[in-house]
UniProtKB/Swiss-Prot annotation:
It comes from Methanothrix thermoacetophila (strain DSM 6194 / JCM 14653 / NBRC 101360 / PT) (Methanosaeta thermophila). The lineage of its organism: Archaea, Methanobacteriati, Methanobacteriota, Stenosarchaea group, Methanomicrobia. NADP(+) binds at Y25, G26, N27, Q28, K49, S51, D83, E84, L85, Q86, G134. Residues 1-182 form the KARI N-terminal Rossmann domain. The active site is at H108. This is Ketol-acid reductoisomerase (NADP(+)).
Amino acid sequence: MATIYRDKDADLRVLKDKTIAIIGYGNQGHAQGANLKDSGLDVIAADLKDSPAWKRAEKDGLRVMTVPEASKEADFIQILLPDELQPRIYREQIAPYLEEGNILGFSHGFNIHFNQIIPPEYVDVVMVAPKGPGDLVRRQFLEGKGVPCLVAVKQDYSKSAKRIALAYAKGIGGTRAGVLETTFAEETETDLFGEQVDLCGGVTAMIKAAFETMVQAGYQPEIAYFEACHELKLITDLIHEGGLMKMWNSVSNTAEYGGLTRGDRIINEQSREAMWEILEEIQSGKFAREWILESQAGLPVKKALEQQESEHLIEKVGAELRAMMPWLGEKK
């Protein structure tokens, strides 16, 4: 079982004499930067000059500068750029300015684990990864709460890397909820596996297959959409709130019996073998190499598949039905 750290296990004073640079003031960057600032720490933000992100950081009261300027000034450099942009920006705008004893931080381990970023030996390399989107990280912090985080140390030059990472996690509110210790390898591989097998890849493939089956059987596409896609949120919300048993206890007896007796026919031995194959592709670096080449080529496969997805009947039907439900577009 994972080791979990709380507020009492972290000391913000570890970071009091350090300048923290948030590289990339996007979804996570704005939340982490604003939370660290509100925790009394010295924070600077770096993004494209005069971009919306730059202006947002200024509005949040942070000093804003270019990536090279921030890298020169900071002691702790938290890289929160998209995975595919990190290696080039690191090589060109961060690495030349690293000094002995600096800390390189990440919220996802992809580029470190797959050697797209290879830091010098004289810096600490840590990860603090909130398990929630930036808006939630910020909102929970302002309410005096926090979002659980993962913490990992890849390189401990200072012999204080874990203390530093835990202090950072406390600064963004993570220790209020709990911080789970992991490794760069475990975070990266499980994150990719979850995205591909169920959260993004598996669930969308299942939705489309169920929808297509019903339409091919002669049912109206609108009715098929409700059953295959729209009602999924009702189920996932119940699981999210209270686990599998809250969901089973909340649906009808008919739904529970049907699901329990038929589910394994969908996720069968062949499906599980495919999951193992995908996991092995992740662990071996095969997927990483594929994604790196795809990014370098300008994302042709991704763009083609996105176009194909956008033309699926379920998208047309879904758009028409969602127009009948204006509350779906209302901000909470």
